[in-house]
C-alpha cells in the first residue's frame, strides 16, 4: 500500500464537530503505509486502539489512484484520530503525526472499480448510525481535490 493523501476537514459537519474551520482549497495530510488496514475477502478488518486515550473516527470515501494519478478504485474507509496525542502535540507546537497517522489509523473496506457518481457513505458503531452523508456534500469536489493534488504534489518531470 502506498502513502495515503487525506483531505483535511472536507465536510462542514465534521469541521463544526471538531470546532474547526473549512479551508478555501483542499489541504492534505499524509498517512503512511503502516497506517492502512485492509479488509479480508469477506470485508472484515480490525484494529487495536489504546483504550485509555480519546479516539475519534470519521467515515471516508477512499480513492486508489493509478500511475498517472487517475482514479482506479474506491472503497469506504474509517479515518481514526487519537485526540489525546493530537491535542498534546498541537499544544506543544509539535507535528501531530502521532495523533493522526499511527499504525492502523486508516481502516479500508473492500475495493471496487472507480465510479464518479454521488455516493452515500456512513459509519455505524454497534448498530447505531454515527455518520451519514453523500459525496456531493464534500466542501471540495473530487475534481478540485485532484487538481490541487496534481498541481501541487504531482510528479515533477
Task: Give the ranges of each region predicted by the language model.
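Catalytic-core "active-site belt" of small-molecule-metabolizing enzymes
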Residues: 1-156
Amino acid at each position: 500500500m502506498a502513502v495515503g493523501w487525506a483531505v483535511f476537514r472536507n465536510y462542514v459537519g465534521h469541521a463544526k464537530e471538531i470546532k474547526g474551520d473549512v479551508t478555501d482549497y483542499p489541504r492534505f495530510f499524509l498517512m503512511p503505509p503502516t497506517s492502512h488496514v485492509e479488509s479480508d475477502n469477506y470485508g472484515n478488518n480490525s484494529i487495536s486502539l489504546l483504550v485509555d486515550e480519546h479516539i475519534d473516527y470519521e467515515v471516508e470515501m477512499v480513492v486508489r489512484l493509478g500511475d498517472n494519478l487517475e482514479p482506479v478504485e474506491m472503497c469506504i474507509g474509517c479515518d481514526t484520530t487519537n485526540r489525546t496525542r493530537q491535542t498534546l502535540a498541537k499544544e506543544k507546537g509539535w507535528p501531530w503525526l502521532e495523533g493522526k497517522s499511527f499504525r492502523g489509523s486508516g481502516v479500508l473496506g473492500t475495493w471496487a472499480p472507480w465510479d464518479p457518481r454521488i455516493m452515500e457513505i456512513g459509519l455505524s458503531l454497534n448498530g447505531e448510525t454515527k455518520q451519514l452523508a453523500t459525496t456531493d456534500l464534500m466542501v471540495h469536489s473530487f475534481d478540485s481535490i485532484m487538481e490541487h493534488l496534481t498541481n501541487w504534489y504531482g510528479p515533477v518531470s
